[in-house]
Amino acid sequence: MRRALLLAALLACAPPAFADRLKDLTTVAGVRSNPLVGYGVVVGLSGTGDGNSQLTQQSMQSLISRLGLSVETGDLKAKNAAAVMVTADLPPFLKIGQTLDVTVSTVGQAKSLKGGTLLMTPLMGADGEVYAIAQGNLVVGGLGVEGKDGSSLTVNIPTVGRVPRGGMVEKMVETPFLETDHLVLNLNRGDFSTAAAVAEGVNRTFGPDVAVALDGTSIRVRAPADPAQRVSFMSLLENVEVDPAPPVARVVVNARTGTVVIGGTVKVTPAAVTHGSLTVRVTEDQRVSQGASVVVGNNATVVAPGEPVVTPDSQVQVVEEPAKAFVFDPGVSLSSLVDAINAVGASPSDLVAILEALREAGALRAELVVI
């Protein structure tokens, strides 16, 4: 009897089939990356810089003046330098002195950043504060060459490069992770049923009234006040497994490529579909005939070859395919519908037209998204 009760308890606590971890379904409110941006100069280019760009010349003059040197803008040539924008994402909890990757993109007429070096560039957040400093040698995956006759060859994008670990954090971003007595989990895809399932799964693991669903996206979870315990609690929380609700029935159609993505819960009501197609073919051809010229002389007539004559020949052909009819039983899946349409050789455009018509008729039990 005791073994039976223990087995029943273990089965009750076991995660449901096809369950997902909370770390795959949710994010913690306030724990996110922050975009950084800065303006800088890349030097050391092999003649592929901005040339006589006034913006780059002024930037170089300002940079040189900060080093204690005085130079006129007209004396600077930007053939080996380029004005660039530097961007990066500052991950949460990154500490002062740690590094991050930065992306460098040209803003002027530079043809390539290959072989360049990014000079010290402050990276600012949306509040105007400097959070990191970027500097280092660029890694450029593209290639761009140009001949003296004006011919050029470009492979990939040579005007964008990266500096691996080229940014150093100078200021941390404060997060509310340790400031309140609770955490808020936000679903990646809002759904009331999934929010309720998450709250139920957390309460089943940590005890009643620990989590409560605020709406279809957010779930509030009580957390320990001690920072050390909160980190351990979060490591357990993000590994709680729940069974998310089935997604909303949705059909996504790419009208340009004919790609159709169908959710597993999509159904159609009883419907009859008739669809025919009209094909118009226009062919252009040219007929060439040898013209003839007549020469009369000495009581004789001579026919000599003349200039070739080109005559256009256009043909228009209209082909109307016989209409094809489909009848579907109640509750048939949309995948069966698509299989039936494809079996008769319908084109992707025909499939898109049929799906849109089913939606307008109210026979498609799903949201149709056309991209």
UniProtKB/Swiss-Prot annotation:
Residues 1-19 form the signal peptide. It comes from the Bacteria. One of its GO terms (biological process) is bacterial-type flagellum-dependent cell motility. InterPro entries: Flag_FlgI. It is found in: Periplasm; Bacterial flagellum basal body. PANTHER family: FLAGELLAR P-RING PERIPLASMIC PROTEIN FLGI (PTHR30381), FLAGELLAR P-RING PROTEIN (PTHR30381:SF0). HAMAP family: FlgI. The basal body constitutes a major portion of the flagellar organelle and consists of four rings (L,P,S, and M) mounted on a central rod. This is Flagellar P-ring protein. It comes from Cereibacter sphaeroides.
